[in-house]
Regions:
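C-terminal lobe and pocket-closing loops
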Residues: 118-186
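Hinge/capping helix and adjacent helix->loop/strand transition within the periplasmic-binding protein
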Residues: 12-97, 147, 161-193
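Extracellular/periplasmic bilobal clamshell ligand-binding domains
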Residues: 205-224
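Flexible, acidic loop-helix segments that line cofactor/substrate-binding pockets
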Residues: 193-211
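A ligand-binding cleft/hinge motif common to bilobed small-molecule-binding domains
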Residues: 6-17, 71, 75-82, 109-144
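Short helix-initiation/N-cap motifs at beta->coil->alpha
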Residues: 89-100, 113-116, 207
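Conserved beta-strand segments of alpha/beta enzyme cores
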Residues: 86-88, 127, 200
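Alpha-to-beta junction loops
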Residues: 1-4, 59-61, 103-112, 125-128, ...
Length: 224
């Protein structure tokens, strides 16, 4: 068994090793990282209303984030609010780099996961302005409203964390291990893990795991 995330999948597909999700047996998806949009604590964008006002005024807004899932969910956000021409998306190698650029005033907004940004929110350097999730995050990220609260459709693209096995594993064994991992997610220790690393619960059964991993692969390959 091997821990396997959507980021691992993208790295694998970008490499020259020639492997795809089809070479493995997806077992379970356990949890997910979701994203928020952050602004400087005392910057011009204190809320989504400030972002919308800048768009309505014809301003260009510079946003930083990574090339993978953060860009995917940001594109969904832009499409939902109908403002494709209002943003310049600047690529960074990591969330830490884009957060640093935000604090330095090089960009107006940045994408980021709870784990990557929480320390900077607690220190008062940045603030969350939009939660790209179906519900608000826990404190100290809870001041950011969801898109649904703002009057739009929910926007989210969870970066899943899961488990895979060799492609030769039998169907019976795959079902067994999915059940084992489901039991893990029902323990207090697992809830403590989610809380520690600011992850969202996102357990998927065997069929859903296969579907999600395959679709993530197909979508990523189509975007290249």
């Amino acid at each position: 068994l091997l821990c396997f995330s959507s980021g691992d999948m993208q790295n694998m597909l970008d490499s020259e090793i020639g492997l795809t999700v089809d070479d493995f047996a997806p077992i379970a998806i356990m949890a997910a990282d979701k994203q928020l949009i952050f602004a400087q604590k005392d910057g011009k964008f204190a809320s989504f209303d400030d972002i919308k006002a800048a768009i309505d005024n014809g301003e260009k807004i510079n946003v930083g984030g990574t090339k993978s899932n953060e860009k995917t969910v940001f594109d969904m956000f832009v499409e939902e609010i109908g403002a494709a021409d209002s943003f310049n998306y600047m690529f960074y190698d990591s969330s830490a780099e884009s957060i640093t650029a935000l604090m330095g005033g090089h960009i107006d907004l940045c994408m980021g996961s709870p784990a990557a940004a929480v320390n900077y929110v607690e220190s008062g350097d940045i603030k969350p302005v939009v939660a790209l999730s179906d519900e608000r995050f826990n404190a100290p990220l809870d001041e950011a409203p969801t898109m649904e609260e703002l009057g739009y459709n929910t926007v989210q693209s969870p970066m899943w964390r899961g488990v895979i096995a060799p492609g030769s594993m039998s169907e019976e064994a795959q079902e067994y291990w999915n059940g084992v991992f489901k039991a893990v997610t029902e323990t207090d220790a697992w809830q403590d893990y989610l809380n520690t690393y600011l992850l969202s619960p996102y357990f998927q059964d065997l069929d859903s795991t296969r579907e999600i991993m395959k679709k993530a692969q197909d979508d990523y390959l189509a975007s290249k």
